[in-house]
């Protein structure tokens, strides 16, 4: 799938709000309000991604929005828990040394000495830094199933090669 066709989930709808078709919004973006900067929104309706425009939004114990054409509570309730997505090319371009998490999934992780640790299976945030969850190779000499590797640039993460789909780390394979 090309970047132009790729769909990225940026949030989801919560419960309906009020009687005029407003919905609560759960944003997955770093700055929650920035979800409204992405246009148009794509919402999966009966297995197909359909474009929607936000008519209005506001903060009210979180975020709520009104979609164009959605005017009654009962109709809004059918959108509860549906994902909000945008086309990948709607996301801002990053500099060469910045990455979206989605770009790192599936990349091979190797030590600076060439030992293959596995592939990036997940990433999560901690208070101080992100952590790569690396699913170990089946024949891992150290018997590991997964490794948690802190995403600390230059100290642990030595190189990220987008073309080769490879991350080089300064990490002890036994840990």
Curated annotation (Swiss-Prot):
**Name the record gives this protein:** Ribosome maturation factor RimM
Query: Which compartments does it reside in?
Result: Cytoplasm
Which comment does the entry carry about domains?
The PRC barrel domain binds ribosomal protein uS19.
**Biological role:** An accessory protein needed during the final step in the assembly of 30S ribosomal subunit, possibly for assembly of the head region. Essential for efficient processing of 16S rRNA. May be needed both before and after RbfA during the maturation of 16S rRNA. It has affinity for free ribosomal 30S subunits but not for 70S ribosomes.
- UniProt entry keywords in alphabetical sequence: Chaperone, Cytoplasm, Ribosome biogenesis, rRNA processing
Among its keywords, does the record have Chaperone? yes
Instruction: Identify the PANTHER family for this entry.
Output: RIBOSOME MATURATION FACTOR RIMM
- What species is given as this protein's source? Aliivibrio fischeri (strain ATCC 700601 / ES114)
